[in-house]
From Swiss-Prot:
Encoding gene (name): NDB3
Coiled coil: none
Cofactor binding mode and count: Binds 1 FAD per subunit.
List of residues binding FAD: 57-87
UniProt motif Microbody targeting signal: location: 571-580
EC numbers: 1.6.5.9
Family label: Belongs to the NADH dehydrogenase family.
Catalyzed reaction equations: a quinone + NADH + H(+) = a quinol + NAD(+); a ubiquinone + NADH + H(+) = a ubiquinol + NAD(+)
Protein name as annotated: External alternative NAD(P)H-ubiquinone oxidoreductase B3, mitochondrial
Natural source organism: Arabidopsis thaliana
Matching Gene3D superfamilies: 3.50.50.100
InterPro entries: EF-hand-dom_pair, EF_hand_dom, FAD/NAD-bd_sf, FAD/NAD-binding_dom, NDH-2, NDH2-like_C
Tissue-specificity statement: Expressed at low levels in seedlings, roots, stems, buds and flowers and, to a lower extent, in leaves and cotyledons.
GO CC, any one term: mitochondrial intermembrane space
Amino acid sequence: MRPFAYFERLSQAFHDYPSLSKILVVSTISGGGLIVYSEANPSYSNNGVETKTRKRKVVLLGTGWAGASFLKTLNNSSYEVQVISPRNYFAFTPLLPSVTCGTVEARSVVEPIRNIARKQNVEMSFLEAECFKIDPGSKKVYCRSKQGVNSKGKKEFDVDYDYLVIATGAQSNTFNIPGVEENCHFLKEVEDAQRIRSTVIDSFEKASLPGLNEQERKRMLHFVVVGGGPTGVEFASELHDFVNEDLVKLYPKAKNLVQITLLEAADHILTMFDKRITEFAEEKFTRDGIDVKLGSMVVKVNDKEISAKTKAGEVSTIPYGMIVWSTGIGTRPVIKDFMKQIGQGNRRALATDEWLRVEGCDNIYALGDCATINQRKVMEDIAAIFKKADKENSGTLTMKEFHEVMSDICDRYPQVELYLKSKGMHGITDLLKQAQAENGSNKSVELDIEELKSALCQVDSQVKLLPATGQVAAQQGTYLAKCFDRMEVCEKNPEGPIRIRGEGRHRFRPFRYRHLGQFAPLGGEQTAAQLPGDWVSIGHSSQWLWYSVYASKQVSWRTRVLVVSDWMRRFIFGRDSSRI
């Protein structure tokens, strides 16, 4: 009863002294108002703290492999990240050929970028717009929204930055061949895959209408794929399976009219794969009835025919119903304009250093298909390397000095390590022994600059451009995000190799691409796999490896479940041919 008696006495006090209740109410309201005011209007001292600790603004252009990987990995609260892209999702592009034929649904391979960018300790925001100009002088990017805006809104706007990360990817390369842009389908985006799927169904529906002769039906059902790379080969395989496993059951009269042709300008398809895979793929396509025309270069395309020229100079005309163009990548207009501004107008892609920093722009980075690493060559810096290593200025290097400098060289120039592996050498000592043996010199305890040149003269042969794949872009995004996370620490304590043409060390270790292997689905539940160590596998077992790897590489559990369920649905019910 004590609590009740207490409240009874308190109530009696308010009743006997009304002014007491008024004072309490006024105090409560005033106190709450002060709290609200203090939150809405922080003190001048707080403003001073915020100014001192202003977050550095990172603008990221693009939501592809490089951009999504950068967002997922970045974990430093000192940055404010602004993502700008015309698409508000990340697409798992290796499965786009599967989307074209309904093996996998389009929504199963996309993840909203806001889900990826949503982090508790990193401030991130997204703008659905396309960047059309980069101004490195004023540190601004100019963007254009594709959304409708109200009377107060602006369709074009600019965004300033402290750091700019360019990950816009690339566009399909038409090589300025007449008619390609107007008459061909590309396979770079999810929308491209959806259009191809709709066109395939349209072709079968049109060919089923009465009043057409057989020649016109054959033309409508003739599907041409230009490009014998991984994308073109996989699409041709998917289309073949879609036609023979599903569509011929629904369109039985079209069974003997369908034809798939693959045009490749080189002497073989899948030239980036092992020779065993190339030969197997060509033999399988022949068995499947896919007409592979090697050494055929497209010269012209109109609305019903495609013209191709052989290496002998003979030009043939092929009637078609649909063309899928998959011959390589080209530079986007915004990147071309930016390259002209910074003196790279004659290049095909943005040139960066080994730290993915655009050459000539300290605060701008580029990764993925829009850029290429301009790897410095050892022989270009050989004099500076020797001078840096010769600490006693004696004109020769001792074995100790040689090994010390080679350790830094291996960090700075990845081609050295690649050369050692290609020659089966176990270390730097083997490289030196080989050079001495070739020159007929004795095994001396010191070497001069000419002997150093002789030892390293062949290593630059391993300098190669990285392939334009999602695997490379993803690794670059992860690498750059980790560099940003450790930027403050590495400013004080550099972790990179020694500066050959300067003092001190680089802040970070340079980017190193680690090739994890590649797949080439060939249809009929058969896949070719090429993994590091010259390991090649072809057949049904590799197909199951492909399933497991691609499922594990999804960016979220949502897409992982959707993709696997689509595969199961296809196994049970087949592919959907509805046009919706």
